[in-house]
Regions:
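Conserved SAM-binding strand-loop segment of SAM-dependent methyltransferases
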Residues: 45-52
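Glycine-rich, N-terminal phosphate-binding loop of Rossmann-like dinucleotide-binding domains
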Residues: 67-68, 146
Length: 338
């Protein structure tokens, strides 16, 4: 199988490593930046080009991996549609032109695989199974905190030098749908939502973006509180689920999902292995989930299994983000001083 990777930044390089980990060596990488092309060619021994439109004309690919900044996704997907080539696309935060892409994909019957990385995290898989089993009892409330420190994302370049510094594709804004993709898979979509988002601290290069989102999701029978930020000096992902029978606690620092049973007053610890992390990445960001995600894309190309995410679902998650943001304008009740 032959693959085209469009975009040779941090995610494009990661996807090349994933493909090579799966045994694929016939890879063409595309980037407009000469330094990135040279790095990918030297580090991974792949062919490189500067224009993906030309690459799609010159070669026949089994699949395309789109690892560009979000605002460039649609043009790359259109190119894949033009050449009837299955594609995988990184998580996005903007939906301009996406409805037309979805329509065209359905008309062609083309495989489109939008990223759902955390679906493949062993902790999320464990949590998904536990919630679905009903073992926790009747759910009461859920608390999720996903926090990172924006300058830690790309230590080799300034925040102002790439897309996370602009309002439409800001770092915190991007992580909301990244988390909501797995969250809605586990709990479904909420009935009602409320959210406030703000810029709270100074981060050089991120002056124009909100760095913190606080949301309340109303599921009717239970409530969820979700905080996403890019101001956490230690990268954090913590989840608490309160049920009538059991309480589930996950802190990714522990490498285990922990469940407290009310009847026995005992904890059950469910350890997992997310694999080693690549150089320069947080130790909790193991490579296995990224490899498994690309494996799922390859399996979908070969007709072995459906990819676990769709553009329709991706669009629904983005609409959830926009609905959350729209509620911020409603304002809040003033608390009077005693």
């Amino acid at each position: 199988m032959k693959f085209l990777v469009i975009g040779l930044g941090s995610m494009g390089k990661r996807r090349i490593r994933c493909l090579q980990a799966l045994g694929f060596q016939d890879i063409v990488g595309v980037d407009v930046r000469e330094d990135r092309r040279l790095e990918a060619q030297t580090s991974y021994g792949i062919q490189v080009h500067s224009d993906y439109a030309d690459s799609l004309k010159q070669h026949t690919f089994s699949g395309v991996v789109i690892s560009l900044p979000p605002l460039l996704h649609v043009a790359a997907m259109q190119a894949c549609l033009k050449h009837s080539t299955p594609f995988f696309v990184e998580a996005s935060v903007v939906d301009d032109g996406l409805a037309d892409i979805i329509h065209a994909v359905k008309q062609q019957g083309l495989l489109a695989a939008p990223s759902s990385t955390l679906h493949f995290h062993p902790a999320i898989a464990c949590i998904r199974d536990i919630v679905a089993s009903g073992a926790l009892g009747t759910l009461s409330n859920v608390i999720l905190h996903s926090g990172q420190y924006l300058p830690d994302w790309h230590t080799y370049e300034k925040v102002s030098d790439y897309y996370v510094s602009t309002p439409a594709t800001g770092g915190a804004r991007e992580i909301v749908p990244f988390e909501m993709t797995w969250f809605t898979e586990v709990f479904g979509f909420p009935h009602n939502v409320a959210c406030h988002f703000r810029k709270t601290i100074h981060i050089e290069g991120a002056e124009g973006i909100a760095d913190t989102y606080n949301a309340v999701l109303d599921y009717g029978s239970f409530l969820a509180n979700v905080t996403v930020d890019v101001v956490s000096r230690q990268a954090t992902r913590r989840l608490l689920i309160n049920g009538s029978k059991q309480q589930l606690v996950w802190n990714w620092e522990d490498a285990a999902v922990n469940v407290f049973d009310g009847a026995s007053a005992q904890w059950t610890h469910l350890p997992y292995d997310s694999g080693t992390s690549a150089a320069g990445y947080n130790k909790n960001i193991g490579e296995n989930m990224y490899i498994d995600e690309i494996r799922a894309f390859v399996d979908a190309i070969e007709g072995k299994a459906a990819f676990p995410n769709s553009l329709d679902n991706d669009h629904a998650v983005l609409k959830l983000l926009y609905r959350l943001e729209s509620t911020d304008a409603v304002g809040m009740a003033q608390v009077m001083s005693p």
